[in-house]
Regions:
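Transmembrane-helix bundle of Major Facilitator Superfamily
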Residues: 1-184, 317-319, 326, 344-347, ...
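Transmembrane-helix exit segments and adjacent C-terminal regions of multi-pass membrane proteins
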Residues: 1-19, 242-245, 264, 368-370, ...
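Flexible interhelical linker loops that connect adjacent transmembrane helices
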Residues: 2-4, 177-206, 248-263, 324-325, ...
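Transmembrane core module of solute transporters
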Residues: 9-58, 163, 200, 225-388, ...
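Interfacial helix-cap and linker-helix signal at transmembrane-aqueous boundaries
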Residues: 36-37, 68-69, 157-162, 216, ...
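C-terminal module of multi-pass small-molecule transporters
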Residues: 73-82, 95-99, 115-119, 126-138, ...
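A membrane-interface helix-boundary motif in multi-pass transporters
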Residues: 160-172, 218-228, 297, 418-483
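C-terminal membrane-cytosol helix-exit motif in multi-pass small-molecule transporters
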Residues: 172-190, 208-217, 236-250, 492-497
C-alpha cells in the first residue's frame, strides 16, 4: 500500500520538473542578455522582446492550453507541450539574429502554454484531500519560485563554459526525462462535460493580451501619450472586454467569468498577478545590474541571485503551514508587504552598495514575500473550483502569473529604459560626446559601456561612471514602480481576500468526476495513512 501512496509524490515530482522547465525559461535568458546583445547586436527593445516573446505567447495561450487539456486529456496535452518545447528550444539555440531568436522564443511560449496549466490541473486531480492538496500546491509554488531564481544561476554556470545557445540546449535532456517519466507515471484526466471548443474566444484573448503588452513595450519609443500607445492600450482593453462579454454568452466558455464573482478566486488571482509584475520586472533589471554595474561575469551574476532561491525554498513550507492556521488573507497580504519593502530597499541601493548589505536584504525580502504570496493564493484559486474544471482554474492561475510577469518586464523595463536613456544622453553630451553618439549609447546599457570605452583615455572613467549612474537611475525608478504596485496589492488583499472559503464559495466536488485510477490511488493512500 505504501508504494501506491508514494506514487502520488512521484507524480508530483514529474509535474514539478515540467514546471521547472517552463518557469526557468522565463529567467535563464536574462543572465545571457548582455552576451546576446553583443553577439546578435540586439538593442534594449530587442532584448525586452527576447524575454517577452516567450512570456507573451505563453500568457496569451494559457487559457487555450488549459481548455485543450480539459477536453483532450491533460496528460496528452502535457506530453505534446513537452515535445514541442524541446524542439523549439533547439530552434532558439540555432538562431543567428535577434529576430530569429524572438520568433523561437515565441514558439517556446506556445509549448509552455500547453505544459503549465496541465501540471496544476493534474495535481488537483491526484491530491483530492484538501490538506494534502494544499501541501502539494505549496511544493508546486515553491518550485515555481525557485525556478525564477535558479534560472540566472544555471544560466551563469552554462555561460561560464559555453555560448549563450547552451541556455536553450540544456532543456532537451530535461524534456526527455519528463516525457519518459510522465508516460510511466501520470494518470489521464479530462472534463467529460467540456463542451465545444471556442475559437472566437481563443482569438479574442490572444489578440487582447498581445496588443496590450506590445503597446506597453513600444511606449518609450512612440511616447506614452502618442496615438499608437493610447490607441493600442485602448484597443486591447476593448478586445478583452469583448472577450469577457462573449464568454458570458457561451454555454461552454473557455473562461467562466462568473468565477470572478467569488472574492477568494478573484482577489487571489489579482495578488499573484501583481506579485509577478514586480518580480519579473526586478529580475530583468537585477541580472543586468550585476554584470554591467558590478562587473560580474555571467556565473557570478547568476550566483549573486542565489539568496533569492534559498529564501524562497526556506519560507514556502512555512507559508502553507501558517495559512492553515490563520487563513489566506493575512498570509498573502504579509507576503505582498514584504515584497514591497524589498523593492523600496532596492530603490535606495547605490552602484557601490555592499552586496551583503542592501542588495541581499532587498532580494531576501522579495523572496520571502513571494513564498508567502504565491502558494496560499494558488491554493485559494484551486480550492474554489470543482476538480473537473481544474484546467480552467489552473489556466487562470497561470495566466495571472504570466500576464503580470509580462507586463512587469514591459512596464518596469520601459521605465528603466526611459530613465537610463534620458540621463546617459545628458551625461555623455556633457562630457563632449556628439549628440548622435550619446543617443546611440542611450539605446541600451551595453551600448553605453561600449561608447564609454571609446572616449579618450582621460575621460573613460568618467564616461563609464556616467553610464553606471544612469542605469542606477533607471533601476531606482523601476523599483519604485514595483514597490507601489505591490503596496496597492497589499491593501487590496486585506480589503477583498477572505481569510477562508465560506460555505457558499466551496466547490461542488461531489459532482466533480475523478479519474478511476486517481480515485483508487487516493483511497489506498488514505488507508495506508490510517495504518
Amino acid at each position: 500500500m505504501k508504494t501506491r501512496t508514494d506514487r502520488r509524490w512521484w507524480i508530483l515530482a514529474v509535474l514539478c520538473l515540467s514546471v521547472l522547465l517552463v518557469v526557468v525559461d522565463n529567467t535563464i535568458v536574462n543572465v545571457a542578455l548582455p552576451t546576446i546583445s553583443k553577439d546578435l547586436h540586439a538593442s534594449t527593445e530587442a532584448l525586452q522582446w527576447i524575454v517577452d516573446g516567450y512570456t507573451l505567447t505563453f500568457a496569451g495561450l494559457l487559457l487555450v492550453g488549459g481548455n485543450l487539456g480539459d477536453r483532450l486529456g491533460r496528460r496528452r496535452v502535457l506530453q505534446l507541450g513537452l515535445a514541442l518545447f524541446g524542439l523549439t528550444s533547439v530552434g532558439a539555440a540555432l538562431a543567428h539574429t535577434s529576430a530569429e531568436l524572438i520568433a523561437a522564443r515565441a514558439a517556446m511560449g506556445v509549448a509552455a502554454a500547453l505544459i503549465y496549466p496541465a501540471t496544476l490541473a493534474l495535481l488537483n486531480n491526484v491530491f483530492t484531500v484538501p490538506r494534502e492538496r494544499a501541501t502539494a500546491i505549496g511544493i508546486w509554488s515553491a518550485v515555481s519560485g525557485l525556478a525564477v531564481a535558479i534560472g540566472p544561476v544555471s544560466g551563469g554556470a552554462l555561460l561560464q563554459h559555453f555560448s549563450w545557445s547552451s541556455v536553450f540546449y540544456v532543456n532537451v535532456p530535461l524534456v526527455v526525462v519528463a516525457l519518459v517519466a510522465g508516460r510511466l507515471l501520470l494518470p489521464e484526466s479530462r472534463d467529460p462535460r467540456a463542451g465545444r471548443f471556442d475559437p472566437l474566444g481563443a482569438l479574442l484573448s490572444v489578440a487582447g493580451i498581445t496588443l496590450l503588452t506590445w503597446s506597453i513595450i513600444e511606449a518609450p519609443r512612440h511616447g506614452w501619450g502618442s496615438a499608437a500607445t493610447v490607441g493600442g492600450i485602448g484597443g486591447a482593453l476593448f478586445i478583452l472586454a469583448v472577450f469577457g462579454w462573449w464568454q458570458t454568452r457561451r454555454p461552454d466558455p473557455m473562461l467562466d467569468v462568473r468565477l470572478f464573482r467569488n472574492p477568494r478566486f478573484s482577489a487571489a488571482s489579482g495578488a499573484i498577478a501583481l506579485a509577478f509584475f514586480g518580480l519579473f520586472g526586478f529580475i530583468f533589471m537585477i541580472t543586468q545590474y550585476f554584470q554591467v554595474v558590478r562587473g560580474y561575469d555571467p556565473l557570478g551574476a547568476g550566483l549573486a541571485t542565489l539568496p533569492f532561491a534559498v529564501v524562497t525554498a526556506a519560507f514556502s513550507p512555512a507559508a502553507i503551514a501558517v495559512m492553515k492556521r490563520v487563513g489566506t488573507k493575512v498570509v498573502v497580504a504579509f507576503g505582498l508587504a514584504l515584497m514591497s519593502s524589498g523593492f523600496v530597499v532596492a530603490a535606495s541601493t547605490a552602484a557601490g552598495s555592499p552586496y551583503w548589505g542592501k542588495v541581499v536584504i532587498a532580494m531576501s525580502l522579495m523572496a520571502a514575500g513571494l513564498a508567502f504570496t504565491t502558494g496560499p493564493a494558488t491554493e485559494a484559486i484551486m480550492g474554489a473550483l470543482p476538480r473537473d474544471k481544474a484546467g480552467a482554474g489552473s489556466a487562470v492561475n497561470d495566466t495571472t502569473r504570466e500576464v503580470g510577469g509580462t507586463l512587469g518586464v514591459a512596464i518596469i523595463g520601459s521605465v528603466l529604459n526611459s530613465g537610463y536613456g534620458s540621463h546617459v544622453v545628458t551625461a555623455l553630451t556633457g562630457l563632449g560626446a556628439p549628440t548622435a553618439v550619446a543617443h546611440e549609447a542611450g539605446q541600451s546599457v551595453v551600448a553605453g559601456v561600449i561608447t564609454a570605452a571609446h572616449f579618450p583615455a582621460a575621460l573613460q572613467p568618467a564616461a563609464a561612471d556616467a553610464v553606471r549612474q544612469a542605469f542606477m537611475t533607471g533601476i531606482h525608478q523601476g523599483s519604485l514602480v514595483a514597490a507601489g504596485v505591490t503596496a496597492v496589492a497589499t491593501i487590496a488583499a486585506l480589503a477583498f481576500l477572505p481569510a477562508r472559503a465560506r460555505a457558499s464559495q466551496l466547490p461542488a466536488t461531489a459532482a466533480a468526476p475523478v479519474p478511476v485510477a486517481v480515485e483508487r490511488l487516493s483511497r489506498m493512500g488514505s488507508r495506508a495513512q490510517r495504518r
